[in-house]
From Swiss-Prot:
Family listed: Belongs to the isochorismatase family. RutB subfamily.
EC number: 3.5.1.110
GO molecular function: hydrolase activity, acting on carbon-nitrogen (but not peptide) bonds, in linear amides
Name of the protein this chain belongs to: Ureidoacrylate amidohydrolase RutB
Residues annotated as catalytic: 29 (proton acceptor), 138, 171 (nucleophile)
Annotated Pfam families: Isochorismatase
PANTHER family per UniProt: ISOCHORISMATASE-LIKE DOMAIN-CONTAINING PROTEIN, PEROXYUREIDOACRYLATE/UREIDOACRYLATE AMIDOHYDROLASE-RELATED
Length: 233
């Protein structure tokens, strides 16, 4: 039952109770790199055609979350302009990052992809943070790795994380998994996420999450649960 203090969110594999004062919305990497034509994913050959719809879904989620008093935490993924944080050949990231590989294959892009301070790194215009929102940076797929996220959450008593953003199968899943290991309850809103790769990787990521690491819900159910809370108040 939804009350003024708790949302009962319909989800898979079962509904989950979200205490409003212990829940934050985590916005993963809604940057030009991942959601805009001419950004890194687009230049690397990934299909970003679903990103526009995801942006609209996220806007609706953030509006109701802010209205309910939930913290909104934005992540941006990338590195310093000299790519020191990306790691050199001794780092697996140097070998596996598609952004770094794309720049090595196309030298004219060197310094343009995921470089802090550049257009590619910037959040998309439609999802700029509002006063009171929190912005964090990360240099690897997981938002918990070498970032302030854990301390930001613990200092606010946050135990429940609602995830939106790109890419479902990479940074969203990586951050939710790491949160699971740190005793956070993670829920992803499936229609407010988009994958990097074929459709089947979206399905696989959501299967992994709902079966092993967390819960899967929708933007409509999230907004509906918030609305029921307001009615209960």
């Amino acid at each position: 039952m939804t009350t003024p203090d708790t949302l009962m969110l319909p989800a898979r594999p079962e509904p989950i109770a979200l205490p409003v004062d212990k829940t934050a919305v985590i916005v993963i990497d809604m940057q030009n790199a991942y959601a805009s034509p001419g950004g890194y994913l687009d230049l690397a050959g990934f299909d970003i055609s679903g990103a526009a719809a995801v942006i609209d879904k996220i806007k609706g989620v953030l509006d109701v979350a802010r209205g309910a008093g939930m913290p909104v935490i934005y992540f941006q993924n990338g590195w310093d302009s000299d790519y020191v944080e990306a790691g050199g050949p001794g780092s697996p990231n140097w070998h596996k990052s598609n952004a770094l590989k794309t720049m090595r294959a196309r030298p004219e892009l060197q310094g343009k992809l995921l470089a802090r301070g550049g257009w590619d790194y910037d959040l998309v215009d439609a999802l700029k943070p509002e006063p009171g929102d929190i912005q964090l940076h990360k240099t690897r797929y997981s938002g918990f790795f070498n970032s302030q996220l854990d301390s930001v959450l613990r200092s606010r008593g946050i135990r429940h994380l609602v995830f939106v953003g790109i890419a479902t199968n990479v940074c969203v899943e990586s951050t939710l998994r790491d949160g699971f290991f740190l005793e956070y309850f993670g829920t992803v809103l499936e229609d407010a996420t988009h994958q990097a790769g074929p459709d089947f990787v979206q399905k696989a990521a959501l299967y992994n999450i709902e079966t092993f690491f967390g819960w899967v819900s929708t933007t409509a159910d999230f907004k509906g649960a918030v609305g029921q809370r307001e009615g209960a108040g």
